[in-house]
Amino acid sequence: MELVVKDVQNVLSVSEIIFARDFNEALIHQVVIAYSASTRQGTRAQKSRAEVSGSGRKPWRQKGTGRARAGSFRSPIWRSGGVTFAAKPQEHSQKVNKKMYRGALKSIFSELIRQKRLIVFENFSLDAPKTKLLVQKLKDINLKNVLIVTNKIDNNLFLASRNLYSVDVKDVHSIDPVSLIAFDHVVITVEAVKRIEEILS
């Protein structure tokens, strides 16, 4: 299988086992859900009626006052009382096997190629860490919402992209299924493609 290298008008031979897989929607869905769940902090916490401060005595006697009966100052229906079903810190991460994760990435890359959303460059870099240079570079190739994947993080690219909400820069070791799906296009260098082949083979 061959991919067109845009900036040098050349072709790059890649493995069909990795870049020509069928689209496995169920697998990708499972991996994306698991990845998204693992990014949750899970640190929310509220106090139940057993944990809020306050006396344990009965506010007033059961009968004879004309008021509604009450048994505790910490009742959830009282102001400053506890929360009925108090949220507690929770671990949300889900287990995904390496084979499944890699299979999902292969399927995503294959679909990006089929949809012509994966654009390969021999070299994609900037002379200085300037946002306007990156904006102009993307304008020249008619791209807006884009993920840029390089073999190693290019400091100029990284700094130039930080102020652009529709552009992200990652190296091959930090790509994830959600980022690959979220952007309209993925710009990737030849070195990065070769490294991804090594990782996923």
UniProtKB/Swiss-Prot annotation:
InterPro entries: Ribosomal_uL4, Ribosomal_uL4-like, Ribosomal_uL4_dom_sf. Residues 44-68 are annotated as: Disordered. GO terms for cellular component: ribonucleoprotein complex; ribosome. GO terms for molecular function: rRNA binding; structural constituent of ribosome. Keywords: Ribonucleoprotein, Ribosomal protein, RNA-binding, rRNA-binding. PANTHER family: 50S RIBOSOMAL PROTEIN L4 (PTHR10746), LARGE RIBOSOMAL SUBUNIT PROTEIN UL4M (PTHR10746:SF6). NCBIfam families: rplD_bact. One of the primary rRNA binding proteins, this protein initially binds near the 5'-end of the 23S rRNA. It is important during the early stages of 50S assembly. It makes multiple contacts with different domains of the 23S rRNA in the assembled 50S subunit and ribosome. Forms part of the polypeptide exit tunnel. Part of the 50S ribosomal subunit. This is Large ribosomal subunit protein uL4. It comes from Buchnera aphidicola subsp. Acyrthosiphon pisum (strain APS). The gene is rplD.
